[in-house]
Amino acid sequence: MFDVLMYLFETYIHTEAELRVDQDKLEQDLTDAGFDREDIYNALLWLEKLADYQEGLAEPMQLASDPLSMRIYTPEECERLDASCRGFLLFLEQIQVLNLETREMVIERVLALDNAEFELDDLKWVILMVLFNIPGCENAYQQMEELLFEVNEGMLH
């Protein structure tokens, strides 16, 4: 499913291609690209749930907003998000790329993935997808995009 999401993000969303694509045509394009129907269905469902945030149909878990509070991860979250992923989320909060709400959206979307393995690079792409879809997060999206591509080029300052 994550491969389908990456393909969709890079092909349709990130490239600013026509975003209003007929779902049947999209499913056929993905099938023609070699993706499994179940993975396609799960990826589209994942994106629909993400769109619910954008449309205000869903809200992330509301947590205490005390700046001195610390996010405690559940065992399920720790299983999916290793120490490097959790540290990266904290780093993004500290540099104000993520806030409490967007962090919770990211965690919820990560837990909704069906990947057996999940790494820091995967998390970075999920963060980009979430920030891209949330109104008012354009600057955070741009910062995250810069971080992603600077790290990939080995030039993180």
From Swiss-Prot:
InterPro entries: Smg. It comes from the Bacteria. HAMAP family: Smg. Belongs to the Smg family. This is Protein Smg.
